[in-house]
């Protein structure tokens, strides 16, 4: 009897994930030539164009050139698991969450690593969280980023862009798995580095108008920004319909003033937590259903851009 012994210490933890399958990404993608209907009612093939759609639902995912090489979400998930398996990270009790957005056109895989944990500046704990993204629509390249999940509020904590990025590739086929694992190993010190920044944010006071400016920037409230530039007072700004009808802006302001500012003080740490609360939990007020997985990532990217402008205490 031949016994195969894995060379990777994380093999059993990753095998447990493999046994769980691909979740909502477990669907086949079919490619077909693209046609258009002519004036006389006949069909004609569009040169060098293919359409991709889900075999189970028929939803169209993307249109690409005939030379395009589609990478399935299952392939991305396999690659992410292989990278983690070869890394030196402690994967005991790892939790994997698979979600798709845009009717299946985009896939997000989050891995939470409870054995990589820190204490945040306000005494909460946060565990390392890794995010892998694959897109059939070319909205995002295949990428992996680091973040954290705060235990008390379950916010997905966004890291500064230069700290968060692990690797990007046009396709999973372009990524050397062993190189990816080596890059993954470098994030073991990332949480401490980011936590030091969080500590400086907690020690940096922020005025109300400055907090409003950062919140308006992240949530796209251009009217609020214009009024701030005109030195309008806070109460007047909040009475403008174009401001209070922005549900994202109002959500963050309510979270900041009603919870995080009271709990953490008037500082950048409180502003940051209000923003990550919005990125993680806000579902909007429109009647149409929000695509939460895509929304969470897009909001996180906006937060990354905003926090670059935080003035940090020395």
Task: Enumerate the predicted regions with their spans.
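Intrinsic disorder/low-complexity polar-acidic segments
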Residues: 79, 85-314
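Feature for intrinsically disordered/low-complexity regulatory segments and propeptides
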Residues: 1-79
